[in-house]
């Protein structure tokens, strides 16, 4: 009986201390470029296929995108030379970045491809999409 009491007291004590040892993993934060993107489906001229464009709808003032001269209406082509084929691709690339990194953004503007090097130094940090 004494042994059972010691086991129960130990179990209660350890379960109360579990919070001290268990630290839930914090959500990873990544820099926010400061753009809102619209995914636009564009049919080919013959109608046989559809491509998706990632059009920049708006830019948050004082964000890395604003300082980098990205403009609403630009079509996002690539981040760090990795072609953007989905929103999750863009998020994955940004999740690999940290504050003070730079980011090479490739956009199409008025039919012309432009590459813009952006500093993420003033980026707000985020942990969700």
Go through the PLM ranges and name each one.
Residues 18, 77, 92-129:
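PDZ-domain C-terminal substructure recognizer with occasional recognition of PDZ-binding tails
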Residues 55-63, 85-93:
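N-terminal post-signal-peptidase region of extra-cytosolic proteins
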Residues 1-4:
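Positively charged n-region of N-terminal signal peptides that target proteins for export
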Residues 35, 56, 65, 73, ...:
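Terminal peptide-recognition signature
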Residues 18-54, 58, 96, 119, ...:
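PDZ/PDZ-like peptide-tail recognition elements
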